[in-house]
Amino acid sequence: MLADLFTAVRLLTVVPLGRTEGGRALRFFPAVGWMFGGLWLGIAWLAREAGLAEGTGALLTGAIAVVASGMLSGLMHWDGLADCADGIGVRGDAARRLEVLRSSTVGAFGVTAIVFVALLQVVAFSVILESGVWWGLAAAPVLGRAGATLAAGLREPARRDGLGARYSVRMSVSEILVATLPVLPLLGWRPESHTALTVATALGLLLAFVVPGPFVRRFGGVTGDVLGATIILTETAVLVAAAVVGGPL
């Protein structure tokens, strides 16, 4: 079990723990999300202490936080988002789209997706920082990685030789419930935040089921890029939801 946790850390971050093999590691993806949530909460706290939690300071902090999260992941998830955007944008069948995913170049669709989603994250982070809805900074990364767990555990891989196949292991309902246990500490936030947090959490889990669907239909299954895109898109949606629904710290 510990080896699978280390493998999940190695896969989702630049921290050199564990091995590069091991399909059961996907059940620990939400737990690894707390590393990113802790990073964002730490940056938010430092920004508040430095007087950068309002106005342009909050926007600057949001940009720093998004870049820091990307660096911790080695930008792999963002690469997956770009590849999936390019794959969806290209004309052709599933085989042609999978060729695009394998390409090392980023096209117009990929660049547009990265810029648009990154801007959404920066703005949402800054709004959360100013309003004090800090639970969103923890919820978004955890639920984003839970989305990847659900995508890999409930859907078939697009090909047998890719990252999606390596980490996609069919999971039972009980295994999925256990895998999402790291989400529960979020519910221990201050009681007055529960309504807003419940809304954002429910949205995040719903999107975790929904987001991979269009990719799976177009690519014929789950790939490593699909998992990365699912993480980023679910994470962003929860950030935006937290910024919109609000609630005290």
What are these regions (language model features)?
Residues 1-74, 78, 82, 88-90, ...:
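Hydrophobic alpha-helical transmembrane segments
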